[in-house]
């Protein structure tokens, strides 16, 4: 029994890494996307963060704003992980089903009268700042810009299944703007 306790105490020290759990309040509110992120300290300057966003809910009326996407990101911290400035590079992949919505930057202008369904992939760079509120809590702001590629099918209306076209698009755009509440697990 004593040997087991000794092994467990060593394993805890050897494998101890700082982990943060977070929720992006800005994207959650703007896109009505429940989300959860996890960030793992890799070294004295690097962390790996991954966020999952999911909205299965109808938007009301003929509107449709269903989607899910993941956004992993490798971050370099200027001072220490989970405190101050950071730069990152990340990937993203997701699936969407959007109709009767206004999308920013002139993306899919036809989405106001037609439904678009497809997937997207992307790569981007980011900058952010983590405010330490207490030993366990933090507030993080981040903005990313990147290259996105999407393949889509276009339908005449939000509910009907009559396909009117398909295609793909490439564009450079903001890929993330976040204000996240962060909880540190140690």
Question: Where is each model-derived feature located?
Answer:
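Transmembrane beta-strand segments of Gram-negative outer membrane beta-barrel proteins
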Residues: 16-25, 89, 175
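Extracytoplasmic loops and strand-loop junctions of Gram-negative outer membrane beta-barrel proteins
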Residues: 18-21, 56, 106-113, 160-166
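N-terminal targeting signals for Sec/Tat export/insertion, comprising classic cleavable signal peptides
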Residues: 27-47
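Predominantly the C-terminal beta-signal and adjacent terminal strand-loop region
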Residues: 134-186
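Surface-exposed strand-loop-strand hairpins of Gram-negative outer-membrane beta-barrel proteins
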Residues: 30, 51, 57-65, 158-169
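Bacterial N-terminal signal peptides
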Residues: 1-9
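Gram-negative (and chloroplast) outer-membrane scaffold detector with strong preference
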Residues: 40-141, 178-183
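Sec/Tat signal peptide C-region and signal peptidase I cleavage site
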Residues: 10-16
């Amino acid at each position: 029994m004593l040997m087991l306790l000794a092994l467990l105490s060593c394993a805890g020290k050897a494998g101890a890494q700082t982990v943060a759990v977070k929720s992006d309040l800005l994207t959650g509110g703007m896109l009505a996307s429940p989300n959860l992120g996890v960030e793992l300290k890799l070294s004295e300057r690097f962390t790996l963060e991954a966020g999952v966003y999911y909205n299965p809910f109808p938007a009301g009326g003929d509107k449709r704003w269903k989607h899910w996407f993941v956004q992993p990101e490798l971050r370099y911290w200027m001072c220490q992980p989970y405190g101050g400035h950071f730069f990152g590079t990340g990937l993203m992949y997701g699936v969407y089903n959007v109709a009767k919505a206004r999308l920013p930057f002139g993306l899919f202008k036809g989405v106001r009268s037609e439904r678009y369904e497809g997937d997207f992939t992307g790569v981007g760079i980011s900058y952010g700042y983590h405010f330490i509120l207490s030993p366990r809590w933090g507030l993080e702001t981040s903005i990313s810009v990147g290259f996105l590629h999407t393949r889509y099918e276009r339908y005449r209306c939000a509910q009907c299944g009559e396909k009117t076209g398909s295609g793909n698009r490439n564009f450079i755009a903001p890929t993330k703007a976040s204000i996240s509440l962060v909880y540190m697990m140690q």
